[in-house]
Amino acid sequence: MKNIEEMPSKSQLVAHRSRGLINTSNTCFMNVILQSLTGCQLFLRVIKNLSDLEDLGKYPTLHSFNQFYTEYFSNPTSNILNNNSNSTTTTSSSSTTATTTSTSNNNKSQTPTSPIQQHHQSQTNGLSNQPSVATQSQQQQQPQPPINPKHFNDLVKSFNSKVSPVPQTTVSPHSMVQVSKKKLKLQLYNNSLPQTICQQDAQEFLVFLLDLIHEEFLTLIKDIDIPKEDDKSTPTSTSIVDDNWEVVGKKGKTAIITNSQQELPKTPISQIFSGVLRSSFNRTGSKESITVEPFYCLHLDIRPEEINSLEDALKFFMKPEIIEGYTCSTKKIEISASKSWSFESLPRILIVHFKRFAFESDTSKKLDKLIRFPTQLSLSTASNHQTQKKYSLFSVVSHHGRGLSQGHYTCDIYQPQQAQWIRYDDSTFTEVKEQDVLNREAYLLLYQLVN
């Protein structure tokens, strides 16, 4: 359970079935994150391996995901898309409107022609490795209804008290553990949002959710691996590493390494989503000072005019920043100093966040700017520039509207088994071309490490 390498092979893909998610009360920010995680094969494998675990109810978020995916992949019937020349399940272009209300589901059965329809019709118990040709009777079946993500009501309330889904008749069998967003260990910057603004931010919710699942896995692992009385080993927990150590780099240059945060323990979540950033601080007459810290989400500034692509944003992020007016603490004189970022280690799933929102007084302003991004991305670490790790895009989350508190989220998810992109807009979804995805004003990008 602790090591993701012990789980089934990556080649054993969980077949993805498209299902819409009902917007219960301005919860489109949650829906796009749930759809994105559903499109993540590594995450699906983790949750799938929890299905036979006893007392899963002790871990509220894991239990909610297990219930959610049981419903999501249940009743393997035909998942038919309307094919009025554009293969869509909705009759309106709601994905481009700035509204937080759910789009009505006006699906009508038509003859399916897309590969994903044949795949959905061939599934058994929600799992399949190869698509098959659908029969005529299967083609005439109605699409599955959208799911009400009621399992996450308590979680949404704990994330933001201003977002309160409509009460459900089903009572949760457990109480949600309250987790303050201020205590998240993996936030690399403080948004400091005014309290009067409704903080319905998909990026914040994703980091909040991953941290919550990570903490529950720590408890689960500790419960499973209870040490014996004579076992003197340290139990699984968040442990403090040495504050500083000195390393010798290229050409004999030395540097002081500092861990700015607590070491992130090994769980399936940290193994999938967590990387490590390296901050290098250089000043005249001193050794290089390096700070390393874990991250779930890479926050990239896109405000400068020269930034028009993901590659531009990454270069700007890693560009050395000259620190003006830096004074030596011992000599009390001004010296040259600079700071730069690089990757110490890269995650299996890379989450990129384009910083589109700025907050002034009690209002949020959005930067509407098209940032190009590739379907294939290559990155390297600070210690190994020669070896490029290759990533493949599988999720694009877009925000529509001028402000964070009044906008709407949609997402595009890639289904590798059918080589098809699907656009989700709450309870509706539609097949889209890759170029349509690349033309989106993306807010979040999710890339998966290849091989």
UniProtKB/Swiss-Prot annotation:
It comes from the Eukaryota. Its EC number is 3.4.19.12. The keyword Lyase does not apply. Disruption phenotype: Null cells differentiate into prestalk cells preferentially. They develop precociously and exhibit abnormal cell-type patterning with an increase in the prestalk domain and reduction in the prespore domain in the slug, and spore domain in a fruiting body. Null cells do not form the normal spherical sori seen in mature wild-type fruiting bodies. Instead, the sori remain elongated, similar to those seen in wild-type fruiting bodies that are not fully mature. The upper and lower cups of the fruiting body, which are derived from prestalk cells and anterior-like cells, are enlarged. GO terms for biological process: protein deubiquitination; proteolysis. Residues 116-135 have a biased composition (Polar residues). InterPro entries: Papain-like_cys_pep_sf, Peptidase_C19, Peptidase_C19_UCH, USP_CS, USP_dom. Gene3D superfamilies: Cysteine proteinases (3.90.70.10). Residues 83-115 have a biased composition (Low complexity). Residues 83-154 are annotated as: Disordered. GO terms for molecular function: cysteine-type deubiquitinase activity. It catalyses: Thiol-dependent hydrolysis of ester, thioester, amide, peptide and isopeptide bonds formed by the C-terminal Gly of ubiquitin (a 76-residue protein attached to proteins as an intracellular targeting signal). Residues 19-450 form the USP domain. Coiled coil: none annotated. PANTHER family: UBIQUITIN CARBOXYL-TERMINAL HYDROLASE, UBIQUITIN CARBOXYL-TERMINAL HYDROLASE 10. Belongs to the peptidase C19 family. Required for proper prespore cell patterning. Plays a role in stabilizing mkkA by preventing it from being targeted for degradation. ubcB and ubpB differentially control ubiquitination/deubiquitination and degradation of mkkA in a cell-type-specific and temporally regulated manner. This is Ubiquitin hydrolase B. The lineage of its organism: Eukaryota, Amoebozoa, Evosea, Eumycetozoa, Dictyostelia.
